[in-house]
UniProtKB/Swiss-Prot annotation:
One of its GO terms (biological process) is meiotic DNA double-strand break formation. It comes from Saccharomyces cerevisiae (strain ATCC 204508 / S288c). ATP binds at R13, N36, G37, G39, K40, T41, T42, I65, D67, Q158. The modification Phosphothreonine is found at T568. InterPro entries: P-loop_NTPase (IPR027417), Rad50/SbcC_AAA (IPR038729), Rad50_eukaryotes (IPR004584), Zn_hook_RAD50 (IPR013134). Belongs to the SMC family. RAD50 subfamily. This is DNA repair protein RAD50. Binds 1 zinc ion per homodimer.
Amino acid sequence: MSAIYKLSIQGIRSFDSNDRETIEFGKPLTLIVGMNGSGKTTIIECLKYATTGDLPPNSKGGVFIHDPKITGEKDIRAQVKLAFTSANGLNMIVTRNIQLLMKKTTTTFKTLEGQLVAINNSGDRSTLSTRSLELDAQVPLYLGVPKAILEYVIFCHQEDSLWPLSEPSNLKKKFDEIFQAMKFTKALDNLKSIKKDMSVDIKLLKQSVEHLKLDKDRSKAMKLNIHQLQTKIDQYNEEVSEIESQLNEITEKSDKLFKSNQDFQKILSKVENLKNTKLSISDQVKRLSNSIDILDLSKPDLQNLLANFSKVLMDKNNQLRDLETDISSLKDRQSSLQSLSNSLIRRQGELEAGKETYEKNRNHLSSLKEAFQHKFQGLSNIENSDMAQVNHEMSQFKAFISQDLTDTIDQFAKDIQLKETNLSDLIKSITVDSQNLEYNKKDRSKLIHDSEELAEKLKSFKSLSTQDSLNHELENLKTYKEKLQSWESENIIPKLNQKIEEKNNEMIILENQIEKFQDRIMKTNQQADLYAKLGLIKKSINTKLDELQKITEKLQNDSRIRQVFPLTQEFQRADLEMDFQKLFINMQKNIAINNKKMHELDRRYTNALYNLNTIEKDLQDNQKSKEKVIQLLSENLPEDCTIDEYNDVLEETELSYKTALENLKMHQTTLEFNRKALEIAERDSCCYLCSRKFENESFKSKLLQELKTKTDANFEKTLKDTVQNEKEYLHSLRLLEKHIITLNSINEKIDNSQKCLEKAKEETKTSKSKLDELEVDSTKLKDEKELAESEIRPLIEKFTYLEKELKDLENSSKTISEELSIYNTSEDGIQTVDELRDQQRKMNDSLRELRKTISDLQMEKDEKVRENSRMINLIKEKELTVSEIESSLTQKQNIDDSIRSKRENINDIDSRVKELEARIISLKNKKDEAQSVLDKVKNERDIQVRNKQKTVADINRLIDRFQTIYNEVVDFEAKGFDELQTTIKELELNKAQMLELKEQLDLKSNEVNEEKRKLADSNNEEKNLKQNLELIELKSQLQHIESEISRLDVQNAEAERDKYQEESLRLRTRFEKLSSENAGKLGEMKQLQNQIDSLTHQLRTDYKDIEKNYHKEWVELQTRSFVTDDIDVYSKALDSAIMKYHGLKMQDINRIIDELWKRTYSGTDIDTIKIRSDEVSSTVKGKSYNYRVVMYKQDVELDMRGRCSAGQKVLASIIIRLALSETFGANCGVIALDEPTTNLDEENIESLAKSLHNIINMRRHQKNFQLIVITHDEKFLGHMNAAAFTDHFFKVKRDDRQKSQIEWVDINRVTY
């Protein structure tokens, strides 16, 4: 089941476009509180937009995005990101991106590509879709609810929250979408369409069934004719039976002769069996001798070698581990050398770049020197290489020209200063005396008043600041300045500017390329007719090639055609028609040869039937003897051993006996070792062989138990009992070996007889099968010829025709291409308008990506600039605070000084007034004369100084640039070249060390491989010891068999066999004569059989599977008839099911509405409310419903729309949405209530809160139940007792920039 758990908002409505706000949704309750206009509803709008892709009501024209007029930006990017769990438990993230561009007079709203990402259990992410339309369809599917439920129920907008009481047409539209009525209507329409199409198919099937019935009747007539011919063949069979009775008498005599053959055959059979056994063992001896290294050792010596082999393997393993440790240390050293090499390569690159800058600076110095010389002629003829001398002379020239300016200014300054001093003294004297005269009269009373005020202020003054607070603020100011300096040293903004400039350059290059493609498209359009013609020809060529490919695929892939006319993948098209003509001629020739062979084989077949019966009698007697021996063996063999398994069981028993004996010997050999290992394990808790401590107690206890078992005395007794049991069982098997040999001898005779019988049968069968094969071949050849005529020849002719047309089209394409190449100068060759536009479209996509990157970089730069500004402003605020504190501290001292000074000044004023009045008149006359002289001197000074200052500024600017570059050149000459050479040498030394280390590593690796090979050879050596033991045993068995063969009397048995063969030949000659007479009769039967075969062949070809086809078509007809009937039944059942589904859902909805209304509504005027669904009509397309919300007052039903208050509307709408959510939201238990208390009085608010509390309480254990409540009323949270379900709520507020922010708040901070 699905659930949502995190939402991120950026640039939506009042949410800042530069910062991202995030909210996490809990279970079972998420609370969002905030004042009106803070941005609470925006959260619901973002949830709805993320899940459905629908914008909120009345938000066209980009008003859903943060207003660019507020930020002063032209491009606003907004993003909504929702993290949720899908209905199948998969973690997913959906991202929606939108953009608002501000132009001069209008704004442009764009929906950008989004993203739907799935996250698996290991954290790997996979993008499922990026297109907005696909997201609109896929997100509701992953949430497990239809889009209508998300839009009208789960994330219903506040403006649309009263939709259950909207006008009837709007209400019907929304309920039809919620019930998905159109989906079921389309299903019914599809069923009706299928039924209509099937009616047409039924008519055609009826015609086909009638035609097949006629062919079925003809087939029955032919079968009757075949039956009559078979009757004649049966008459001939009776005559053949008399001849066969005589043949049976000969067969009985042959059987008696065969019985006399048994005695000598037993001896020969036993000899033969011994020879076969000898041959088998000899093969094993030879195989082992060739596959192993034979050791010239006795069997005991080999067994001792095998027992001591494990210690050698252990030593080799220890040696191999030491080598691998050496390799590991060499690899670590190689890694450190590689790291050093990388750092040296990086430093070398930096120094080489510095060297390149050094060369450029030297050239720049030469250019600056020439420019200076050309402009000021202040240098001597110095070579460009002596830049130190150039720098020295420039410095001297700079000092000279600066001194000249200084001298001029000083000269005028002295003269002007003298005159100004005189004038200033006069003016100052006049001003001072006048002001003193005027102010001193006023200041006396003012000073007295100020003194009094300062005295009062000093009394009431409070120390607002101390020296400690001043020191604290100074420390903060120093910290912030250091942070600013650190931030500026990182050069973040210049780096971002550089990236933006690089991307802008790329964008300019791409725009130029797009313009070039646009020019090519325009030029291409000028030859539109030729390009159009070329496009049609290319299309025709592709069509012809497709047809040729289809013909080629049919010729190569059709199994029937491939058998007749095989083609390779690399066949020559030009030779195809000739190859077919050769094939057709060969077919005609093969048919003629096949007919000739059929006549010859028909004659041979009649002579091959008489050899079968004699051999069959011999088999019967041998079978009886075999049964007696089998009965004897069955009575004496053990229950777990059958006759067929005797040799395998005997071999397995010998092997088991040998294994048991070896186990006993091995136990006796290793008993002392196991006792020592047990002692060490119990005492030291370590392995006796490798001395390693045990990993844990469980491993130790397991090993101790195993060692105790092997050292137990009962264990040896068990091994001895096993050896004795195996030995007795092996002896009982060997006692029956002679009967097995007898049985094998009888089986061999039966096999020989069966071979003779099979040979005779094979002769007859071969003749018959060859004749049948030739008949089949004849039919096959005729079918192949017919296939070649009817199917292959038309394909070959069409292929040849298409090849010719394709060649003509290619010539036309080449001609037009050559004509177009005159106008086309592109390196890419001739391209059509569509091809050019496709490339231009790809470039436009790249351009959009570049612009997006530039926009992102610009946004990052702006953020960094704002961060810098905030830091600077903070420093200024701290400086102001420090200044204010310092001013406050000094203020008290200043007041004391001021009071004292003012009192002294009051005494001096009275004496100065009289002196000032007389002196002012004399000073005014002297001032007028001095002012006239001073004005003339200043005009002359300004002209000369302005000209010289301009010259000095130009010289200083050029010389400063020269000296800066010169200092960089000198620094690199002093340090850069030496460091570059040192780095190169160190890099070469490092490479040599790495090469030497690699050689050592290769040498060690070869040693490891050699040791591993030796270890593998050791395993082979162990295997070789075991196989040498096996070879000694086989040779012993071979000697025993040879002695047994030499003991038997073979010569007498062979003489008896010769007599038997002579008598058998006489009987066989007589048998063959009778068989020849019998063959004549069989020949006549063959002719009749040929007629039957001809008729049968006609049945197989012309009327092949006629009854099956008739039955198939008849069944198809009946099936389709039944299907149409089933479709009618299914349509009615579906319609009925839809009605039932609709009725049940409406019952559930109304039941929940009734319960919630009665628990919530506190008024007495409305008893309850319901949703009425009235059936409109039963049209061709199905039933339709109208919906309305009704209320009950004293059992009277009334339409609620237009008859209820605003508060009742809100409450009814919330209850209906809750009911719909519980009914249709099984897979997605989320529902959001935006301002549910709107228009509700206090009592109904409290009732609604309690109802929500009960709903949460009932569904809190449902894993995916999530109730989201948005409200400005914190009392509502108290009525809900929200603290019982969550420990926090989210507060939405505006910051000082009026941007919306989401804040996590403890639920206990709510004041009810």
